[in-house]
Each structure stands twice: as C-alpha cells, then as structure tokens.
Amino acid sequence: MHLAYPAVLSALLFCTGLYGVLARRNAILVLMSVELMLNAVNLNLVAFDVWLSRAAEETLHSGQALTLFTIAIAAAEIGIGLAIVLAVHRNRGTSDIDKLRDTAEGHEPDGPDTDTPATGTAAEKAEATA
C-alpha cells in the first residue's frame, strides 16, 4: 500500500475535525472534533512508521508506541473535558460556547440591566425612598 492513501485519509479526517472545532458551538461537539483530529494524527504516525520501517528494513515500531501513548493521553483528555462540560452544564444550564463566553464576560444577552435605573443620582434615590 502506498503512503499516499493513509496520508490523504488522515488529511481529510484532520480537516473535518478542524472544521468541527471552528464551526460548532456545542462544547461536546468541539471535544469530539478534537478527538477526530487526534485520531488523524495517530493514523499518520502509524502510516509513516510502517513506511519508514520498510524503507530502513528495521522494526522499531516507535510510531506505534507513540500512537498508543497518544491514545492514552486522548482518553484522559476526553474524560476530563466531559467532566468539565457536565459541571458547566449543571451550573449554567447550557453547553453553548458563545453563551458561556457571554456570561463569563458579564454581558446580559436578554437586554438592558433592570437593577439600575436610567436616571438619577444616589442622593435623589435616597430622597425618593425616604
């Protein structure tokens, strides 16, 4: 098998994952897209390991060992990421990245703040309540 086939498939998977990271607003879908990108890198590592071992006539399998390490790191990353998304969803009620960014910056997406009146100073407010 030629090196071009897994390399093209890896590039397509990586581009699909990159599109998902840039276009999706749901945090879980973004995590899934990151995992797709990591799997594309893993495919590329194994393909180049097989190609280089045939060219050098050695069997070091360093690409496969690195792929196993990457899979272990990706499993830990997805576990921690899903735990964070679940905690944020319980606290904020949404997993939409734009809405989370707006609430973190203190912006009210519903409209103007109703706690402060539009006119009047502190002295006028004190006289009005007395």
Curated annotation (Swiss-Prot):
One of its GO terms (biological process) is ATP synthesis coupled electron transport. Residues 114-123 have a biased composition (Low complexity). One of its GO terms (cellular component) is NADH dehydrogenase complex. It comes from the Bacteria. It catalyses: a quinone + NADH + 5 H(+)(in) = a quinol + NAD(+) + 4 H(+)(out). Residues 97-110 have a biased composition (Basic and acidic residues). Residues 97-130 are annotated as: Disordered. Keywords: Cell membrane, Membrane, NAD, Quinone, Translocase, Transmembrane, Transmembrane helix, Transport. The chain crosses the membrane at residues 3-23, 28-48, 68-88. It is an enzyme of class 7 (translocase). It is a multi-pass membrane protein. Its EC number is 7.1.1.-. One of its GO terms (molecular function) is quinone binding. It is found in: Cell membrane. Its main location: membrane. NDH-1 is composed of 14 different subunits. Subunits NuoA, H, J, K, L, M, N constitute the membrane sector of the complex. NCBIfam families: PRK05715.1-2. Belongs to the complex I subunit 4L family. HAMAP family: NDH1_NuoK (MF_01456). NDH-1 shuttles electrons from NADH, via FMN and iron-sulfur (Fe-S) centers, to quinones in the respiratory chain. The immediate electron acceptor for the enzyme in this species is believed to be a menaquinone. Couples the redox reaction to proton translocation (for every two electrons transferred, four hydrogen ions are translocated across the cytoplasmic membrane), and thus conserves the redox energy in a proton gradient. This is NADH-quinone oxidoreductase subunit K 1. It comes from Streptomyces coelicolor (strain ATCC BAA-471 / A3(2) / M145). The lineage of its organism: Bacteria, Bacillati, Actinomycetota, Actinomycetes, Kitasatosporales. The gene is nuoK1.
